[in-house]
Amino acid sequence: MPARWRVAVDWLASHVQLGWASCPLTQNGCIRILSLAGHRNAQSPASVSQRLGERAAGGKHEFWPDSVSLLDAGRAQWDHVLASRQVTDVYLLALAVSHGGRLVTLDRAIGIKSVAGAQAKHLLTLG
């Protein structure tokens, strides 16, 4: 496991009891990444989907539907979005803000100024 991923896995293990959320985008991403043929412990999409579903059903999980749009007037602060690779994290931060949650990421390029209403409590950058 890459060292960067280890940071995220360790953080989740020590905080999962506080609760966690997922949305269609993160669920699909999880299934995609963990079933990649090049992934060290790759499993079939069906297996990853089943395991993710079991963990989500195990409690402390909240499902956040795709209920925001970056096209909503004023939601994304586009002058603070500097590259296309930031768009997904900007969306996830906007979703976290709308649900009163927090985006935990390894990506240092995302900032709270990129989403209207975002505060430090809505974003945690690991590593």
List each model region and its residues.
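Short, well-structured N-terminal submotif of metal-dependent ribonuclease cores
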Residues: M1-S22, L34-Q50, V115-A118
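Anion (oxyanion) recognition and catalysis
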Residues: V16, A56, V97
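Conserved beta-strand segments of alpha/beta enzyme cores
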Residues: G19, K60-E62, K121-H122
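Acidic catalytic patch
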Residues: P24-N28, S49-V81
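Catalytic-loop motifs flanking and including active-site residues across diverse enzymes
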Residues: T26, T88-D89
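Acidic, PIN/NYN-like endoribonuclease modules and their adjacent C-terminal/linker elements
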Residues: S69-L82, V90-G127
